[in-house]
């Protein structure tokens, strides 16, 4: 499994997990976050390896679809880049820096 895809799926999962069914959440979390194999997940839930694979592939598409429609992750990335740029551009403005850090903290608490 390629690391970029794993990282992306883990990140999308963080943003959209609450929109998934319990089964989708379990399979994706075990597969991507906990690095379980398809066989291990199948054994855990007493289903076929193919059923796990199919569910994971469908859930990946669902997560990508949510991001395509809602843009939570991409907006988060852009927002953080802008905050970092402002902090670098105005490092001596302590009031601005503190407010920018508050914004970052809000983002971190949400996700």
UniProtKB/Swiss-Prot annotation:
Record-stated family: Belongs to the UPF0122 family.
Matches recorded under InterPro entries: RNA_pol_sigma_r3/r4-like (IPR013324), UPF0122 (IPR007394), UPF0122_fam_protein (IPR054831), WH-like_DNA-bd_sf (IPR036388)
Protein name listed in UniProt: UPF0122 protein llmg_1069
Function: Might take part in the signal recognition particle (SRP) pathway. This is inferred from the conservation of its genetic proximity to ftsY/ffh. May be a regulatory protein.
Domain of life according to the entry: Bacteria
Gene3D superfamilies: Winged helix-like DNA-binding domain superfamily/Winged helix DNA-binding domain
Ranges annotated as spanning the membrane: none
PANTHER family reported in the protein's UniProt record: UPF0122 PROTEIN CBO2450/CLC_2298, UPF0122 PROTEIN YLXM
């Amino acid at each position: 499994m390629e690391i970029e895809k794993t990282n992306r799926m883990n990140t999308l999962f963080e943003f959209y997990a609450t929109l998934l069914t319990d089964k989708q959440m379990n399979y994706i979390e075990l597969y991507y976050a906990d690095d379980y194999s398809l066989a291990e997940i199948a054994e855990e839930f007493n289903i076929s390896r193919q059923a796990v694979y199919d569910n994971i592939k469908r859930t990946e598409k669902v997560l990508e679809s949510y991001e395509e429609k809602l843009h939570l992750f991409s907006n988060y990335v852009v927002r953080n880049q802008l905050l970092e740029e402002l902090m670098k551009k105005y490092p001596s403005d302590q009031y601005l820096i503190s407010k920018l850090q508050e914004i970052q903290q809000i983002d971190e608490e949400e996700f």
